Amino acid sequence: LKFKNLQFHALGTDTWYANIGPNHPLYHASEVTMEKLLPHPFVRLPDDYFSNLSFYLEIDGVRLEQFKRVVYVNDSAAILSLLRSTDVVRLGPGLSAPDFAEYGIRTIPIRNCQVQINVGWIQRSREMLSTEAQAFVKMLEELYPKNEK
């Protein structure tokens, strides 16, 4: 980043959780394991140029490619609909928990999840933020208050 005259402003860290709807047998679990999730369909967006999660992501010794039933969708509304009406599982950050909870979807910790997501924003060095950009950064900072991890 320094070479490109960019600065990273850290907001916080997160990890991955299992998003599970009311038709999933593990809906009331306080914690899940990847082994217990494997028999269920996994819903996700397709990998893109910048994210190739299928080949490198591993949680507690289980790689995403080990899911035998994967449902690829092209938008978040389809994910939400499937989570609400079937036994699919989605993996994602805890930040989205309040949004999913509005629709009766639980965000459940995954045992031994070593995934760490560093959340932040990037700014050009020596460049002032516009009023709109400052407001957006403030909104982001409210999602990751300084007094948390």
How should each PLM-predicted stretch be described?
Residues 9, 35, 80-81:
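Alpha-helical segments flanking ligand/cofactor-binding loops in enzyme cores
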Residues 47-107:
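Hydrophobic hinge/microswitch elements
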